[in-house]
From Swiss-Prot:
Summary of subunit composition and partner proteins: Binds ribosomal protein uS19.
PANTHER family reported for this sequence: RIBOSOME MATURATION FACTOR RIMM
Name this polypeptide is given: Ribosome maturation factor RimM
Source organism: Methylobacterium nodulans (strain LMG 21967 / CNCM I-2342 / ORS 2060)
Compartments, as annotated in UniProt: Cytoplasm
Length: 204
């Protein structure tokens, strides 16, 4: 159900006049910077494209602060398949890289084209959508759309707090996706947010 969307920055964060790209349908969220990596200006980058490295294929992106962000180098980071180490044009030291922390990156929607089928969605479009049940009760928020080899999953952060849960992104579990309303309707198993059971080794 998922389709992969195959000037120096001033990383001081958004100003009072910064655009609200999160609510602008002309832009699609592709990733978010994390903490600085090392001393040479590298920074961790969480990619929301199905192929994480594809985030580097769109040319300069637009930061949530409205400024152009040019990724000059990318490589996989250890620990998570969607985490990268990035170099950014104009960022050469740790302090400048650290100033990028939590800066969201967007691309204009026309750069992505359009999904071919009605049940295909850009993974980046799903990030941040509200998750509700058939009665309309808010259950959580989509934080990621990982795929570990067995099919697309929705990583859902529960509304009441606690550990995120993974739900297969199939029509059986996700009967409705409403991008315009910014919500998905799910038919979850009863134990979706249940704490993980301890392994036999933990009980010894």
């Amino acid at each position: 159900m998922q389709r992969d969307p195959a000037g120096a920055p001033r990383p001081a964060g958004a100003s009072a006049a910064a655009p609200d790209l999160a609510g602008d349908p002309a832009f699609v969220l592709l990733g978010e910077f994390g903490r600085a990596h090392g001393l040479q200006g590298e920074v961790r980058l969480k990619s929301y494209t199905a192929d994480p490295m594809a985030i580097g294929s769109y040319g300069p992106l637009t930061g949530a602060n409205g400024r152009a962000i040019a990724l000059t180098a990318l490589r996989p980071a250890s620990g998570a398949p969607d985490m990268l180490i990035a170099r950014v044009s104009g960022v050469s030291g740790r302090d400048a890289a650290e100033a990028l922390n939590r800066l969201a990156l967007y691309v204009r929607r026309e750069c992505l084209g359009a999904p071919e089928d009605e049940d295909e969605f850009f993974s980046a479009d799903l990030i941040g959508l509200a998750v509700v049940d058939a009665a309309g009760t808010r259950l959580g928020t989509i934080r990621a759309v990982p795929n570990y080899g067995g099919g697309d999953l929705l990583e859902i952060e529960p509304t009441g707090g606690g550990a995120a849960a993974l739900l297969p992104f199939t029509r059986a579990f996700v009967p409705k996706v409403d991008i315009a309303a910014r919500e998905v309707t799910i038919d979850p198993p009863d134990d979706l947010f249940a704490p993980a059971k301890p392994s036999p080794e933990d009980e010894v």
